């Protein structure tokens, strides 16, 4: 089920059609965390940066200072929001590639509509100076605001040269200013069978209660 209705127009461009294709196929948005945080997430929900339940922080401490900035739509700090990515295979995940406990939570896209009165879209890493924000779902269809071909680029570095513009756009975010409860979590993506086994053994009851699948998906990791 797409989160946006299909727009048909004689003037529709190839880029707009590309954006719509991504939206039509979108089933989940993603949040990265450490496996040791899972139990508290399932119990208390996903909360913003200031929550007291987080045991392990995998965020970039240098970037954290920039996420103290205040966005101009609602007047909140970026850290006041729970962050989600369209494309989890980005620079933040790459930075944590050596952490065997890093997992990716896949949340039903309905979480966006259910929190539409307190969410933002950023067209790149929300901490970037060039980041633009919107509270309007239709802007996801506008390639002048966000280009999903860039967001889902396969890489941001070619021949040893980094493209920081693409790097930032691959980290475009959905920001939700509320607790996001476990009922929205559809999947837990891990990089190996050992992680899957550990999670299922530790949290079997919770996984069954919320109907959450634990999936080994190497393609989502580095």
Label every model-predicted segment:
Residues 2-222:
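Active-site-proximal loop/hinge segments that shape catalytic or ion-binding/gating pockets
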């Amino acid at each position: 089920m797409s989160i946006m209705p299909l727009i048909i127009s004689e003037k529709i461009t190839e880029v707009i059609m590309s954006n719509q294709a991504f939206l039509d196929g979108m089933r989940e948005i993603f949040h990265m965390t450490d496996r040791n945080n899972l139990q508290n997430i399932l119990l208390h929900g996903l909360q913003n940066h200031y929550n007291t339940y987080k045991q392990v922080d995998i965020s970039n401490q240098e970037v954290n200072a920039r996420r103290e900035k205040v966005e101009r739509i609602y007047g909140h700090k970026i850290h006041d929001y729970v962050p989600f990515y369209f494309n989890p295979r980005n620079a933040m995940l790459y930075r944590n590639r050596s952490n065997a406990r890093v997992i990716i939570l896949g949340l039903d896209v309905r979480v966006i509509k259910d929190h539409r009165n307190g969410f933002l879209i950023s067209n790149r890493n929300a901490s970037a100076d060039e980041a633009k924000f919107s509270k309007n779902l239709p802007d996801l269809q506008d390639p002048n605001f966000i280009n999903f071909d860039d967001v889902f680029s396969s890489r941001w570095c070619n021949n040893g040269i980094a493209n920081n513009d693409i790097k930032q756009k691959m980290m475009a975010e959905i920001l939700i200013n509320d607790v996001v409860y476990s009922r929205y979590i559809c999947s837990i993506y891990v990089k190996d069978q050992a992680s899957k086994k550990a999670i299922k053994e530790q949290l079997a009851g919770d996984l069954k209660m919320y109907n959450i699948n634990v999936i080994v998906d190497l393609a989502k990791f580095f």
